[in-house]
UniProtKB/Swiss-Prot annotation:
Keywords annotated in UniProt: Ribonucleoprotein, Ribosomal protein
GO cellular component: ribonucleoprotein complex; ribosome
Quaternary structure and interacting proteins, as annotated: Part of the 30S ribosomal subunit.
Protein's name in the database: Probable small ribosomal subunit protein cS23
Similarity comment: family membership: Belongs to the chloroplast-specific ribosomal protein cS23 family.
The protein's role, per its UniProt record: Probably a ribosomal protein or a ribosome-associated protein.
Entry annotated with the keyword Ribonucleoprotein: yes
GO terms for biological process, alphabetical: translation
Entry's Gene Ontology molecular function annotations: structural constituent of ribosome
């Protein structure tokens, strides 16, 4: 997947202020994983890249409060137009982020997480 910031930075804005540009084909990084990095939770969501901008595809799911991974998996499986390869790639990256947060992330600053996962869009307070 292309870095989230790179995808959004490449978007062109037309005279009406609307993002325009290339919409990736299947398996070309059509999605951005968004992470809300908090001291006691991490939340995951997925946006779809459309016309050079992004549009929310899923809700935010929290870990460990809920089983964020399982809920994300279920929601992605309900979208039949998402390829198996895309779904696996998204869920694998979600697993990496959750594992990092559980093992080290609670003690790491948001900026360190951004450096570890440059292809993911982060926000938060931790």
């Amino acid at each position: 997947m292309m870095g989230a910031n790179a995808v959004l930075a490449a978007a062109k804005i037309d005279e009406d202020g609307v993002p325009t540009g290339y919409t990736p084909k299947p398996d070309e990084g059509r999605f951005i994983i968004k992470i809300l990095w908090l001291p006691d939770n991490v939340a995951l969501a997925v946006d779809q890249i459309v016309g050079g901008g992004s549009s929310p595809l899923t809700a935010y799911y929290f870990w460990p409060r809920d089983d964020a991974w399982e809920k994300l998996k279920s929601e992605l499986e309900n979208k039949s137009w998402i390829t198996d390869n895309e779904r696996v790639e998204i869920l694998n990256k979600a697993t990496e982020v959750i594992n990092y947060w559980q093992e080290e992330g609670k003690t790491k600053k948001l900026e360190e997480a951004k450096l570890k996962f440059p292809e993911v869009a982060f926000c938060g307070t931790a």
